């Protein structure tokens, strides 16, 4: 915001941070109903505080995005929307995706991207296990190691060999581990792109459009 407006300006924010330990317990039990209700309640608190736009700053919880979005009367910006717009602008249609097991296996992000002309390529089972474990056992606890970085690089390299044109960092913690130049293809960080789009909304008041590719199915 300051970079665009100048001076001493900053983004006016209302933040509601949930206890991830509770969320992790619900995730381990597959209790998405509890997660949905809890996040709907938090969204309503933000709306009551005067928020003009709400962002769910996590990829995994977007499995219940639609339920949360319909529970409030202000717009919500899907975390994948700015990433899809960036991929479309770059002319990319087939990309590797790394995230939690839920994001990689449950299909909700796969469908969201595919409907907009982007095919997500997921790691194999061993790769998904490794990516997920590093997120939950290390990154969410602030642990960043070179060993885990190499594992991620190998997983991405395998997907690039299969035709991935870029990699989507589909978990907000992965940017702690990987930086531009760590892999051979462009990286698109959902967290960073989400923040940029929200910053633009704060500056100009224009809600980002929902990118829809002219070819709404991608079966390549």
Model-found features: residue ranges?
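Short, well-structured alpha-helical segments in soluble
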Residues: 34-49, 150-164
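Conserved beta-alpha
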Residues: 75-129
């Amino acid at each position: 915001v300051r970079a665009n407006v100048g001076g001493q300006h900053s983004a006016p924010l209302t933040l509601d941070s949930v206890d991830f330990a509770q969320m992790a317990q619900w995730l381990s039990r597959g209790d998405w109903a509890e997660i949905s209700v809890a996040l709907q309640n938090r969204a309503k608190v933000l709306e009551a505080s005067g928020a003009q736009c709400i962002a769910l700053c996590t990829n995994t919880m977007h499995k219940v995005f639609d339920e949360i979005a319909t529970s409030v009367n202000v717009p919500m910006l899907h975390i994948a929307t700015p990433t899809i717009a960036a991929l479309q602008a770059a002319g990319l249609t087939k990309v590797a995706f790394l995230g939690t097991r839920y994001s990689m296996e449950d299909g909700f992000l796969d469908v969201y991207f595919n409907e907009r002309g982007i095919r997500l390529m997921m790691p194999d089972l061993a790769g998904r296990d490794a990516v997920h474990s590093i997120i939950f056992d290390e990154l969410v606890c602030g642990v960043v190691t070179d060993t885990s970085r190499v594992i991620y690089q190998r997983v991405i390299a395998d997907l690039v060999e299969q035709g991935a044109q870029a990699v989507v960092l589909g978990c907000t913690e992965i940017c702690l581990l990987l930086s531009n130049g760590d892999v051979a293809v462009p990286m698109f960080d959902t967290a960073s792109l989400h923040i940029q789009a929200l910053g633009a909304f704060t500056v100009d008041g224009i809600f980002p459009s929902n990118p829809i590719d002219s070819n709404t199915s991608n079966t390549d």
